[in-house]
Regions:
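Amphipathic alpha-helical dimerization/coiled-coil segments
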Residues: 1-2, 75-104
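Beta-hairpin "wing" of winged helix-turn-helix
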Residues: 51-62, 66-68
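A cross-family signal for key residues in well-ordered alpha-helices
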Residues: 8, 20, 51, 57, ...
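Acidic-residue sensor for enzyme active/binding pockets
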Residues: 26, 51, 100
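Short, hydrophobic-biased segments on the C-terminal half of alpha helices
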Residues: 47-48
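N-terminal helix-turn-helix DNA-binding core of bacterial DNA-binding proteins
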Residues: 2-41, 65-79
Length: 104
């Protein structure tokens, strides 16, 4: 899975909303479409982008295709955010040290 595909997938608020819905468990296309004021093909396009990003998986159950969050797929995003957490933690620690030295 490409990092670019993951970030592209989560860039859209509708896709983030679909992911939040899927955090409650598997849903069919009909269940997902019923929650949005958009056409079935539009929802299908969003789901395809999420699947390409590795954020959801699809499985067949009879005639239905059930969509579910893919465990661990957000690790790419988490790792990216963690890098910047460490960066800012270091910058803030340096600022604190500078301020404390100025107080002396």
């Amino acid at each position: 899975m490409s990092e670019q595909l993951v970030f592209r997938a989560i860039a859209d608020p509708t896709r983030r909303s679909i992911m939040a819905m899927l955090s409650g468990g598997e849903r069919s296309l009909n269940d997902i479409t019923a929650q949005y004021e958009m056409t079935r093909p539009a929802v299908t396009k969003h789901l395809k982008i999420l699947e390409q990003g590795g954020l959801i998986r699809v499985r067949a159950q009879g005639r239905q295709r059930l969509h579910a969050l893919q465990p661990g797929a957000l690790k790419t995003v988490s790792d990216w955010v963690s890098f910047f957490d460490q960066f800012w933690d270091e910058k803030l620690a340096n600022l604190k040290q500078t301020v404390e030295m100025d107080d002396d």
